[in-house]
A protein has these predicted regions:
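Conserved phosphate-donor/acceptor-positioning beta-strand/loop module used by diverse small-molecule
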Residues: 99, 114-133, 167
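Conserved lysine of the Walker
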Residues: 34
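Extended, domain-scale alpha-helical bundle/helix-rich regions
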Residues: 665-669, 747-852
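Hydrophobic anchor at the beta1->P-loop junction of P-loop NTPases
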Residues: 26
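Conserved substrate/cofactor phosphate-moiety recognition/catalytic segment
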Residues: 39-84
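Conserved divalent-metal-coordinating catalytic cores
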Residues: 192-220, 229-234, 267-268, 287-293, ...
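Extreme N-terminal, non-catalytic leader segments
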Residues: 1-23
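Small-molecule kinase domains that catalyze NTP-dependent phosphoryl transfer to phosphate-bearing small molecules
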Residues: 127, 132-183, 188
């Protein structure tokens, strides 16, 4: 094929020699390989009979810009001279190849406007790779301080906005193949280098694409095939069968595959998995039956031109999987989902494996991938070059002999939000994140622990509450109301270490993470000696790193944050890690004192916080009805929400965690069995249980007065309140009473005596009835507090929406606001519109980058910012029930939810409305064992999987029918 292409290019000599020439402008940073590529391109054009002038940037500087320096201004002037010279030479009818840095948008735009035959080729190389090569020693001199004004280091490099061709040179560039791609630009009608142009191989049907790639691949191989159309089969199936059987492999096990014209991007859509493939077929009769099955799967949208192809079955498989060469949002990542356990080729595509792995790697850092995946990435890079497409979906398999097979390749079916020229911004942003991780991981004089790690789920789990890519307004409000200061004030009040002035949550370019070292410090009881505190924090961090699936269960499985009846047994684990009996006694005593202070008597801390929440409910009408402007009303709603809402809520949330841990300890020491523990949880009277009852009993108007402020996304201005879109959430014609009465829980006399005895033995200063009251009130109080404070927050969001509308901003615009803008407007006299518009513009720009960033759920080192495996997740199974039902997602029409297992992104209590829709069960991507929705599921008796994690959530959501087996704690894909 390459020979034919070169013959085609040789026909360029027939062109009119007097026609204007073309300019091939090869640009990139110093050391990218521009000169090498330019010389080879010049030689090939010259061999084709073209008149060629090759201009190298260093030579040009010596001839026409000798007096200029290397400042940004001088470099711009030099680049413009190069551009004008190229224009002049091209007017004479010859082609010009110019290899130059010249990374200025101004120059690139001038070239496009003034040079008719302009072709822009961008050689893209990451800085780390350039520093490694450094053939001219430039980067080494910069590092020593002997050089300055180097583009990409201390001078900005303006990557081309719309290059005709991007060539990624991460290692040894295949110069010949690169020149083929450049020459192919000349053959395209408009010369445009869009993502799918200038390809050596064009995407066709699945079978045709594989057939075209087979003789060209160097880093993989393609299984042989027999291909035929539907009309071929219907015309003479005997002849087709004879061809299959006559193949050298035809009498062995084969796979019969679809190759429809409407799949794999042939018609602009992938239709992945829509049509059948039949594996492991042997013999003429079985093959004929399999072919009929595949044709039948084309159904009504098939045609006689659709194809079927048969290949030998790949039986001895060491690894198989799927690679995306872009993230779903268009970010520059390789995403490899693979199975190296089952020995089968279809576990990933079927979503049926329990041991599937997912690896993500920034495309500019291929060296960071494990050796077992290096050859897979090499194959994908080669396919990107051959297909001239940097967004592809590749299925592969590795035989047990180490041979790599390409099973399928198609354009990646994603909706582009940002152009690929933002890849450099992504790389720069991730470099900044890695640097921040390194800085925050250093020892700190006011923190215990020798290292830091970061997670999306521990402690105040932002992934559950605001999401992993929250809108700027959501992120800034969560910081304002919880994670900047409130969290630390309340934890200090409850007897833990004083972490005031430490933000709990950091933002990595808009991705929220908990600083886990700060969090673990805050759970050390006040009074614990510094040496013991430091060793405890290090132990907690090491434990989380060794068992990352516990990241949403740290308070139950890793740290010791309160005294429970099973604490001595739980502490035996740390005794195995160098903690002495004296250490255990000191920690145990501190936890006992802290717990007694929180739960004891009428002066218990949780009682005071419960009273403050009621005060917020009383103050809300005062702010609502005050004769103050909208900005002031927003400001005071948030201020009151902090002081009388989230501050006591943080305390009640702490009490709620302690309550659940105490209840679990009843089960662990044998006072209650697991069924009795579940019955207690089902007997708790929370907002979640009352909302279903009130929906059946109250009028629509009264129901919305009580619950109308709730939103599925508590901090999300784009999430309508219940009273803004009631018919979206509720089926008012089907308001039926709860199917069963609330559970009744009672302790036997013997159980009461046993608990009383244990309380005395463990020196907990509370009687059994008061303890039961605390556990019940702790769980209920946490839910009630959130219900109350979210009313103030929801009102503030509605007012922000109104404020935006008054100044020409849509509600979508308002999502990009930072709450700092409201605070500025309250305390300063600036133009309201200008402040809002500027904040929206900044937020929109930042969030565009945030959408393209992917980070692991736990970051333990700077290197993990660029390449990582998604850790296995250990979901939380709620109830001991089982259910088998079809699947639905929260974005589907609500009327379709009844009788289905519903997929919900987070465990936010604003999703309470789903419980009025008759769902059979639900699964959340994020959320912990003690999350709001876990409590809802427990009290309502609905089977649920809370915190499935990204990989399993996406896999299960893609199924048609699931079984949630909460008894055995497993999820089965039924269809």
């Amino acid at each position: 094929m390459l020979t034919n292409m070169r013959k085609e290019y040789a026909e360029l000599r027939r062109e009119d020699e007097t026609s204007p020439g073309r300019v091939f402008w090869i640009t990139g940073l110093s050391g990218a390989g521009k000169t090498t590529l330019g010389r080879e391109l010049s030689n090939r054009l010259r061999a084709a009979g073209r008149q060629i002038t090759f201009l190298d940037g260093d030579d040009l500087r010596a001839v026409i810009a000798e007096e200029l320096g290397h400042s940004a201004g001088d470099r711009r002037r030099s680049a413009m001279r190069n551009a004008r010279l190229c224009q002049l030479l091209a007017r004479q009818g010859g082609d010009v190849v110019c290899a130059t840095i010249s990374l200025f948008h101004e120059v690139q735009r001038w070239n496009r406007e003034n040079i008719p035959g302009y072709r822009e080729i961008y050689l893209r190389v990451p800085l780390d790779e350039l520093r490694r090569r450094d053939s001219k020693g430039i980067y080494a001199r910069v590092q020593r301080g002997d050089a300055r004004d180097v583009v990409g280091i201390d001078l900005a490099a303006e990557a081309p906005e719309a290059p005709d061709l991007i060539l990624d040179n991460y290692g040894a560039l295949d110069v010949a193949a690169a020149v083929d791609r450049i020459l192919a630009l000349c053959a395209s009608p408009d010369g445009a280098g869009a993502r799918h142009s200038a390809a050596l191989v064009a995407f066709k049907t699945k079978a045709e694409s594989l057939d075209a790639l087979a003789p060209l691949l160097r880093n993989g191989c393609v299984l042989p095939q027999v291909r035929f159309s539907v009309v071929d089969w219907h015309s003479d199936n005997a002849e087709v069968l004879a061809r299959v059987i006559a193949a050298p492999w035809g009498s062995d096990r084969v796979i019969v595959r679809s190759s429809s014209r409407g799949e794999d991007g042939s018609a602009g859509r992938s239709q992945a998995g829509k049509y059948d493939s039949v594996l492991g077929v042997t013999g003429s009769a079985a093959i004929a039956q399999a072919i009929d099955q595949v044709i039948d799967s084309f159904a009504n949208d098939g045609s006689d031109e659709d194809q079927i192809f048969v290949q030998p079955m790949l039986d001895r498989v060491a690894m198989a999987g799927v690679v995306f060469s872009r993230s779903p949002s268009g970010g520059p990542y390789f995403i490899i989902n693979y199975d190296d356990r089952s020995g089968l080729t279809d576990r990933v595509t079927a979503g049926a494996g329990d041991n599937l792995k997912t690896f993500l790697c920034l495309k500019s850092r291929p060296g960071a991938c494990p050796p077992s995946l290096a050859s897979v990435i090499d194959l994908v890079r080669e396919l990107e070059t051959l297909l001239s497409c940097d967004a592809i979906d590749v299925e592969f398999a590795v035989g047990d002999d180490g041979r790599l097979y390409l099973l399928q390749v198609r354009p990646l079916a994603i909706e582009w939000q940002e152009p690929s020229t933002n890849d450099e911004k992504v790389e720069t942003a991730l470099a900044n994140v890695a640097r921040k991780v390194e800085l925050l991981s250093r020892p700190h004089p006011y923190l215990h622990g020798s290292r830091a790690i970061f997670g999306v789920m521990p402690d105040w789990n932002p992934a559950e509450i605001i999401g992993v890519r929250p809108w700027p307004l959501s992120l800034s409000l969560y910081r304002e109301l919880i994670t900047d200061a409130i969290w630390a004030y309340q934890r200090d009040n409850y007897g833990y270490q004083n972490l005031r002035s430490f933000p709990l949550m950091v933002s990595f370019h808009g991705l929220p993470y908990i600083d886990v070292r700060v969090s673990f410090n805050s759970f050390v009881p006040r009074g614990v000696p510094d040496d013991l505190a430091g060793r405890l924090v290090n132990y907690y961090i090491d434990r989380l790193l060794s068992e990352p699936h516990l990241h949403d269960k740290v308070e139950f499985e890793i740290i010791f944050s309160c005294y429970t009846l099973d604490l001595p047994e739980r502490m035996s684990r740390i005794a195995e890690h160098g903690f002495s009996p004296q250490d255990l006694a000191e920690l145990s005593g501190a936890l006992r004192r802290l717990t007694n202070r929180i739960i004891h008597g009428e002066t218990a801390l949780w009682r005071r916080d419960r009273g403050k929440i009621d005060l917020l409910a009383q103050r809300l009408p005062t702010v609502r009805n005050a004769e103050i402007d909208k900005i002031s009303r927003i400001y005071w709603l948030i201020e009151d929400c902090k002081r009388y809402g989230t501050l006591p809520f943080a305390g009640l949330a702490r009490a709620g965690f302690i309550a659940v841990q105490l209840l679990q300890s009843f089960v662990e020491v044998g006072v209650l069995n697991a069924e009795e523990g579940a019955t207690f949880m089902a007997s708790v009277d929370t907002v979640g249980s009352r909302i279903g009852q009130d929906f059946a009993q109250l009028s629509k108007a009264d129901f919305l007065v009580r619950y109308g402020h709730l939103r599925p996304g508590t901090y999300d201005i784009l999430s309508p309140r219940y009273d803004e879109a009631p018919d979206l959430y509720f089926d008012w014609s089907n308001a039926r009473p709860a199917s069963s009465a609330p559970a009744r829980f009672a302790l036997s006399i013997e159980q009461l005596r046993r608990i009383e005895q244990l309380l005395k033995e463990h020196e907990l200063d509370i009687d059994v009835l008061s303890l039961i009251e605390f556990i019940k009130a702790g769980i209920e109080g946490r839910e009630y507090a959130k219900f109350v404070f979210t009313r103030s927050l929801s009102d503030a969001l509605s007012l922000i929406k109104q404020l935006g509308e008054e100044h020409g901003l849509s509600v979508e615009d308002c999502a990009f606001l930072n709450y700092d803008a409201i605070r500025t407007l309250y305390s300063e006299s600036g133009s309201v519109r200008e402040v809002l518009v500027e904040s929206v513009a900044r937020g929109r720009e930042c969030h565009a980058l945030t959408r393209n960033l992917v980070l692991p759920p736990i970051i333990a080192s700077p290197d993990e910012v660029f390449a990582f495996h998604l850790p296995p997740s250990q979901p939380n199974f709620i109830t001991r029930k089982n259910v088998t039902a079809p699947v639905a997602s929260v974005g589907d029409p609500p009327e379709s939810f009844a009788g289905r297992i519903l997929f919900v992104p987070s465990a936010d209590p604003g999703f309470d409305w789903i419980f009025t829709r008759g769902i059979s069960g639900f699964v959340t991507q994020f959320g912990g064992a003690n999350s709001h929705m876990a409590i809802r599921a427990s009290e309502l008796g609905i089977p649920a999987v809370i915190g499935a994690g990204e990989a399993m959530y996406q896999r299960w959501r893609g199924a048609k029918k699931l079984c949630l087996d909460c008894t055995s704690q497993r999820v089965l894909v039924i269809a």
